[in-house]
Amino acid sequence: MIAYKLVRRGRDGNLYPLFIDRNRPYVFGEHRIAEYIPTKGFAPRLGFHCCFTPYAPHLKQNLKSGEKRVWIECDIDDFKTYPRPPSQGGEWILAQKLTAMRVISQDEVKKLNNDI
């Protein structure tokens, strides 16, 4: 199933998770299996956090620190949904298997979000 994930674009140009296992880059085409990585300050929710659409209003895309975030399209499998309030984008996906496929442009993000 296609899903969307917000990631950090590192200074080296690689794409990294926002919070958990944040130093391991995503590689397009690489199949990843979720691992439990305890991280202080975060609830223990095993799985790659993804969205049905590229919409997460509680997460900024351009931070004051200069960090840039972009949406990637992913192929996911073995997932469950996790209910969240509309202010956090509604339902989240917790996927056990993820393959990062490509960065989606801001124009694509707008179109995908207008289509819902």
Describe the predicted segments one by one.
Residues F42-C50, P54-P57:
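Catalytic toxin/effector domains delivered as secreted proteins or via bacterial secretion systems
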Residues R11, Y55, F79-T81, V103-E108:
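Generic "edge-of-domain/loop-turn" microfeature
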Residues L63-I104:
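Charge-dense polyanion-binding interfaces
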Residues M1-R45, Q61-K68, K80:
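ADP-ribose/NAD+-binding catalytic cleft of ART/PARP-like enzymes
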Residues Y4, F48, A100-V103:
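Generic preference for hydrophobic/aromatic residues in regular secondary structure cores
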Residues A95, Q106-I116:
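Mixed-charge (acidic/basic) macromolecular-recognition segments
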Residues P17, I33, C51, I93-L94:
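Intrinsically disordered, low-complexity, compositionally biased regions/tails
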